[in-house]
């Protein structure tokens, strides 16, 4: 019985892996991304807790709404992570962020189970990043960004991201609790790996922007 309960709670517990992702994002100066990860963790954990034994008291919203925000937070997390990787200049970065936030809200409201909820944000972001990097390569007449970005960030991050999506859409029927938990872990790892080492808009030294707990809690 104890093993069964532990297995049922696995998706809820594994949702907490987004906390380290939020912590890493905040440390690197990506405060907006950290808030999105925390938002995703909160609603994903509560959503899965409603499925768990004896945890229905945590369901402070309708199950359907919790599911919506769980999927929505995940899609937006993918979007802001890839935009951070692309290192777009302002105001393009802010405009693209809002574009993703608004379009994802409508798309996921229509269908929160199909491939398009994630393939749309990922495909659009990858296309924009590819165009930008190819333009930079043409200007520099060399590799852009540095080789280390491809080997240490893009390559490993994309591998974990692809693994997460495969687990989510193709293997969950094997054993939902374990597979979905590994999906959470793989997704969080992809966010951490794809995020640049430093946000150039966050400032440095005494001028560095800081994220406190009060601000972080405002996202929920």
UniProtKB/Swiss-Prot annotation:
This is Protein myomaker. Residues 1, 59-64, 111-112, 175 are extracellular. Disruption phenotype: Homozygous knockout animals are viable. While, larval and early juvenile fish show no overt phenotype, adult animals are small and develop craniofacial deformities. Mutant embryos lack fast-twitch myoblast fusion at 24 hours post-fertilization (hpf). No alteration in the organization of slow-twitch myofibers, that do not fuse. In adults, fast-twitch musculature shows variably-sized hypotrophic fibers with variable degrees of fatty infiltration compared to wild-type siblings. It comes from the Eukaryota. The chain crosses the membrane at residues 2-22, 38-58, 65-85, 94-110, 113-133, 154-174, 176-196. The keyword Membrane applies. Residues 23-37, 86-93, 134-153, 197-220 are cytoplasmic.
């Amino acid at each position: 019985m104890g093993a069964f309960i532990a297995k049922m709670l696995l998706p809820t517990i594994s949702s907490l892996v987004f906390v380290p992702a939020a912590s890493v994002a905040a440390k690197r100066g990506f405060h907006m991304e950290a808030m999105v990860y925390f938002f995703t963790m909160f609603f994903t954990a509560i959503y899965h807790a409603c499925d768990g034994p004896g945890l229905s008291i945590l369901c402070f919203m309708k199950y359907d709404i919790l599911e919506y925000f769980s999927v929505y937070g995940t899609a937006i997390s993918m979007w802001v992570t890839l935009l951070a990787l692309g290192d777009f200049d302002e105001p393009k970065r802010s405009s693209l962020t809002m574009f993703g936030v608004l379009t994802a809200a409508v798309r996921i409201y229509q269908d929160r189970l199909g491939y398009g909820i994630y393939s749309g944000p990922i495909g659009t972001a990858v296309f924009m990043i590819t165009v930008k990097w190819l333009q930079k390569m043409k200007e520099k007449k060399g590799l852009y960004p540095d080789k280390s970005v491809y080997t240490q960030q893009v390559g490993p991050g994309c591998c974990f991201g692809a693994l997460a999506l495969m687990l989510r859409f193709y293997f969950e029927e094997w054993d939902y609790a374990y597979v979905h938990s590994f999906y959470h872990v793989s997704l969080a790892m992809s966010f951490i790996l794809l995020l640049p080492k430093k946000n150039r808009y966050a400032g440095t030294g005494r001028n560095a922007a800081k994220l406190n707990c009060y601000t972080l809690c405002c996202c929920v």
